[in-house]
Regions:
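Bacterial N-terminal signal peptides that target proteins for export
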Residues: 1-7
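C-terminal motif of bacterial Sec signal peptides marking the signal peptidase cleavage site
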Residues: 14-15
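Short, conserved catalytic or interaction motifs in soluble domains
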Residues: 18
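Primary mode marks residue(s) on the alpha4-beta5-alpha5 output face of response regulator receiver
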Residues: 21-48, 55-173
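Catalytic core of nucleotide-sugar-dependent glycosyltransferases
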Residues: 11
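Assembly/interface hotspot detector across virion components, adhesins/toxins, and nucleic-acid enzymes
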Residues: 3, 51-53
């Protein structure tokens, strides 16, 4: 069977593609103009919550965010690092960044944690993440705090909610 060349071209180009293009995001989540895309990593893990008193109303209880725990994968599905509290991203080569949330936007999908733009507040080690200055969290699925179950009987207990997201890394041009 022969496939006409015009139909083959998109398949060939897709097979040769490296880093996927940056996703479409709201303006407040765009990285600074002097930065360019360096990698897109897929995270698969959990968002951890603790049942505790609300800060603004100690008589009421809520599931409060504690930290993420996720494994990071490249576009081929190969494990390349971990994501955790801080928030931080640590590559298998030992390079690590710790971020600060700069902007957020509701996820387009209901029941998903927000999309974020973070800036690197510290960078350690030489390697994969050593030049990263901004990180977007996009394409989120799941991860929101449980809707119920936080009661006086559950006070201090933790809940782990599965999530996936893409972490899009940017560095100076």
């Amino acid at each position: 069977m022969r496939i006409p060349f015009p139909l083959c071209l998109p398949l060939v180009l897709a097979a040769c593609a490296g880093t996927p293009p940056a996703p479409a995001v709201p303006d407040n989540l765009k990285p600074p103009a002097g930065e360019s895309l360096v990698s897109v990593l897929r995270a698969r893990g959990v968002q951890i919550y603790e049942c505790r008193a609300k800060k603004d109303d100690p008589a009421a209880l809520e599931w409060a965010f504690v930290a993420p725990e996720a494994e990071l994968f490249d576009t081929n599905g190969k494990p390349v690092g971990r994501h955790g509290a801080g928030p931080h991203w640590e590559a298998a080569d030992g390079s690590k960044i710790v971020g600060t949330v700069k902007a957020r936007a509701d996820a387009p999908q209901a029941g998903a944690i927000p999309w974020l733009l973070l800036t690197a507040r510290s960078v350690a080690g030489d390697g994969t993440f050593s030049r990263v200055t901004s990180v977007q969290r996009v394409a989120t699925v799941g991860g929101v705090a449980p809707a119920d179950g936080c009661s006086s009987a559950a006070l201090g207990k933790t809940g782990r909610v599965a999530y996936t997201a893409d972490y899009v890394m940017y560095a100076p041009k």
